[in-house]
Each structure stands twice: as structure tokens, then as C-alpha cells.
Amino acid sequence: MIANNIQDALIQPEAEINAAPTKISGITRKITTYLRWLGSILIILSAVSFMLQGNAEILPAYRYWIGLGLTLLLCAGGLICAYLFHETKGARIFFGLGAAFLSVQVSQVAAMIYAYVQGTNASQPDYSWLQFSQVSPALIGIDLVITGLLLFLVSYASYSILARKHLKTLLWTSVIANALLILPIRDENIVPFIIAGLYFFIRKTECFLHNDASMRLAEGVAARAIISLPLWIMIGRSLLHPASFLLAVVISVILVIYCIYDLKRYTRSTFILYIAQWIGTLSAIAIWIAILAEFVSPRHLGFSSFLPIAVILFALSTQVDYHARLYRFISTLITLGLCYFALTEQQAMAPVVSIAVGILLTIAGIKYREKAPFIGGNICVAAGFLFYWEYAINLYTSAPWISSIALGLAVILLASYIENREKKIIAKSRIYFNELKSWH
């Protein structure tokens, strides 16, 4: 009921609210925008400062109630803006912050439930301000009911203001995300799967919402960011507990997808996207390094173990916005080096892999019109075939007269072919080299 009243108050036309509306000057609009940003930053920094420093000696139950009071204060600010000032921007900011702070409240209740369920076996963070142990079951139950009630009411009001068109989708996603956040599970082998599932669920919702132009405005972006907050809280919380190989891989995969693909939906800043691209690239490489560290003993590491790094760089070169040619060039150099060491050490399947990789590099060079992968691919193919030169020599020595006859026939046929098609061969060679010169 309260949320509906807030909606009705906020969507009233400005002409009905103010009988004689006045036009706000550009300077005033800028000042009010800066003031709103300043106020939001002050609220967030103050809350973070309190969590980190100001509540070390406060009992866990009181910490929750202080945070709850701050959330209610933000909602009260939204009501004042909506009913008293008849102003929408401030109300959106207050209720948006209130919805975001509720995820923090959910994480606190989750810490209480986990500490009670696990008892002395609970894995507690090293920081006292993150420990919520020794809270009575009755108080935990009350906190859980209050948090659940506020989660629905505040989220309903917030998403109604920010993106009323997609209220059901946002509310449903928020409830599921916070429900997973409250689970009393900290197992290093289970949490990564929960994080991965929640991430892809939120990402699917995010992609659906992004297709609506209204959700690309500031209000829509804020609503989309709020539903993702439980995921980032869960990731941050998992880093405070014993890590695992699965967690490292899952977080790295999320970083790759977010930095290479998803961040483009939020910003067009060249600097941010450039930095994010390198973070995503390093995360992709870190995935393979983590797999090697987990499953391969250092004494069994060969040069071929690092071939997937070249594959990763080449695959990313088709998705990144900056230095795509550099990615392919580095990938080609790595491939050449690995093929060289594999062939010189006469590793099993080295010539076959060298020929196969060389063909792929050659095709890529033709597709992207680049010299490095094309020439590198030709070198790999030639090196792979030269590896079998020893077998050709052995064949020749075992039956020299047959080999000599076959070689003589091949030489005569080659001479006849060159003589009959001399002009075509020269013309096509000239076209070939001119085309190669025009490539990057």
C-alpha cells in the first residue's frame, strides 16, 4: 500500500504539482546534480567507515539494528522527497540506496544464521566487524522476518520508482539473489557453483533488461546494478574464507565475461574499457595457469602445456576492441616457440600438432590479412613436414633405386610444368607477393 502511494505521488505530472512551474537554469541543475552525487558518496563512505572502524566493540545484534536504522532513514528520505518536496530524483536516489543497503542487511543475517547453524565449526573471517556469532535464535528469527519484510517492501518501492515497467522481473531476481545470499553455506567446493549459477542467472536477466531502451537510462542502469549487488557481496564474502581451485576459476571466468563483454553495456569510456580488457585478458590466462597448477605436476610440465595460452589470446583477439593484431602477433610467436621446442625435443605428436596449428594460423592470416599469423603458419607447416625428412632418407637408403626413379620422374614432370606455365607462374607469384605486401 505504501509503495503504491509512493508510485502515485512520484508519477504525478509536474504541472499538477506546481501551479506555476519555473524553468530551472542550467547552472542550478548542475549544482543540484553535484549535490546529489556528493550526498550519495558521503552516505556510502560513512556507512563503509562505520562497518570498518566504528563498530569493533558493538555487539553483532546491535550492528544489525544500526544498519537497519540507516536503511529506514534512507527510505524516510525518499518519502520526504516524494510527498513533501514532490521531487522524483531525490526519491529515486534514497530508495535506490535503501535497496542496496538491504543486501548488506541480508548478508549480516546470513552471517548470524551461519554462525548459529555451524556453531564452533563455523569458519569466521579474521575481522571482528564481520563476525556475527553468539546471537540468540529468537533474535535471529526476528531479524530474519524483519529483513524479509523490508526486502520486499523497499525493493518493491525502489524498483517501482526506478523501472516500473520491469518491476516483476527486478523484484523476482532480487528475491532469488538475496535468498541465495542468506544460505548458511561456506564450503569451498559448493560456494563456487552457487556463485556461478547466480551470476549466469543475473546475467540472463541483465541481457533481457538491456534490450529495453528505457533500462539504459540512469534509473534503469541503477536498478540493474542493485540486483547484481548480492552476487558481488557473495564473491567478496567467499574471499574471506578458505579459497579453492574452483573458486579461483569461477571468479576468473566472471572477470573475463564481465570485462570483455558485459562492461560495454554500462559505459563507453575508452579508459575504463581499455583497463578492463587487460584485466579480462590476464584473468583468462590465469584460468589455464590455475588448471595446470591443480592437475599437472611441475616436473611433468612441457612446452605443449602452454599452447592453450596462445589459443586463448587468439580467441580473445576476435572479441577485444584494442590491440587485436597484437594479440594475434603474440599468439603466433608463442606458437612458433612452442612448436620449435616440441620438435627439437622430439615430443610425441609434435609434427602433427605443428602442421595442424600451422594450417590454422595460415587460414587466420588469410582471413585477417595479416603477415605474422600467415608466415608463422607456413613456418609451422614446413617444420612439421621437415620432421619427417628422416623417414624419407631412411626410405631412400633402404631402396635407393626405386627412390631414384621416383625422384627423377618428379623432377622431369616439374620441369615440364614450369616450362608450359612459366608466364602464369610468374604472374601469379607477382600477384601473391603484392597482395602479401599490402597486408598488415
Predicted features and spans:
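Alpha-helical multi-pass membrane segments and their bilayer interfacial helix-loop junctions
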Residues: 1-440
